[in-house]
Amino acid sequence: MAVATYGFDNENHKTMKGEIRMDYAKNKKYFQPVNLKLGIIVCIIGLILFAATPIAGIVGLAIGAFLIYLQVGGRPSDSDIDAAVTSQLSNMKARALKKLGLDEDEVSEIAPISFDGYVYNKSASIKKGKDDKYRSNKYQAVMFFFSSNEVHCYTYDFSITESSQKESTDVYFYKDIVSVSTQTDGSEYSVGKGKSSQFDYEYFKLTTTGGTSISCAVRNIDDAQRSINGMRALIKSKKMA
């Protein structure tokens, strides 16, 4: 059973010390489809005009090249997007402790455990990268802290394409935690021309006796499983005490 919870949305949330401010406009380009048709057509027209009127042809080629650049220039790579979310999480531990109102020595049963991943719900913009990994414009991270009697949870949601962030906290008694596990779910992303493709992803889930739960998609399932094993061992020992 959760014994405390609160949260907020802040459209103008200030960047904490050590974080790099998001370039939202640039990140948006990552999720926008590339359309070179207009630029190519203008370039072809420029080539045709060049034979009769070189100056007009050069102008046409320049305009066509500029239109193509607008589509491909300054577009972030897969690694750029990953770096953006990593930077945003750089101060998560300090942020979490402050929001929970805790000192680190109060939650020292084991080291904090965190899970994080891209959000794949219907409101998110989703793209399959060149590395065959799926990314979206929304991200979520969850961090757990462990005291002698309780598990303190901090959840941080944010967008990489607009200034939108949300924080929330929960506290659970060990005896009320039913399970911690990884599960599989599915989502879909647009492949253009009104078509979509489906994919599966793994997520972490904590469930309590009251039926409440916390879940978060995970980017690295192997690391997540090791963390879950550590949580299970601690929860089991606390219930047996």
Predicted features and spans:
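Short, Lys/Arg-enriched N-terminal segments with co-localized hydrophobic residues
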Residues: A4-R21
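N-terminal topogenic membrane-targeting module
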Residues: K17-F31, G64-R135
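Alpha-helical transmembrane spans
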Residues: K28-D78
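Phosphoinositide-binding peripheral membrane targeting modules
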Residues: S136-K138, S148-K193
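Short, surface-exposed charged micro-motifs
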Residues: A141-M143
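C-terminal structured domain segments
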Residues: G186, V191-T212
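Pleckstrin homology
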Residues: D222-A241
